[in-house]
Amino acid sequence: WDTLALLGITRSDVVFLNDKARYKMVLVGSSLTHDGLSNTPPHTKVFDIINRLQGEYDGPEKIYVSRRTWMHDKTGNIGTNMTEARKCVNEDEVAEYFISLGFEEVFCENLSMKEKIGLFRGAKVVAGPIGGGMVNTIFSPPETKVISIDSPTFFDINTRFEYSMCHTQLHHFTDTEFAGDSTGWVEPGDVGVLSISGGLNSPWKVNMDSLKEFVSGI
């Protein structure tokens, strides 16, 4: 509802389907994450809509997008919470490094839509482990520097995340590795689906020496 309100669409403008009405035509949008189109480039009109969204937030110029949900334990606003399954096991060290560089740690799950739009529109440098929070760079202007710390094999199937960031000054850091067993599995009977546990959704860690060298060169 927050996003619709920012586009001038109120609750009274929304009509829900019901079994007492007959419709001559119904247009159903495709899933952004779970069908054959999820990893194809978005239509250009998508960005026309996104750019209409206005946010307000007096935030810092350098932000670290944290996945350390254990710091506050508020996960109700996370759609699919993979912060524990695909946990960066040395993120405490990663976060403290960026904080030492003057970055402010932010938790997107604790912000409203308007606050997130304002935060990412205003930030000049954005860094963090790849995940839902980093996708908010879709609101960032082209001149924003973005440092995406990529977990192993994540972008093998999650190209849609790239499309939310590639309009910025994007830098991928890839010197990461799985931390322990990364064997993937799915529930019995789920034929032809991606691993829902293990695999790319396994715990991982960052090579800190390599990260520091990488960041110093940007």
Question: What kind of region is each of these model predictions?
Answer:
Residues 1-218:
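The feature primarily captures lumenal catalytic ectodomains
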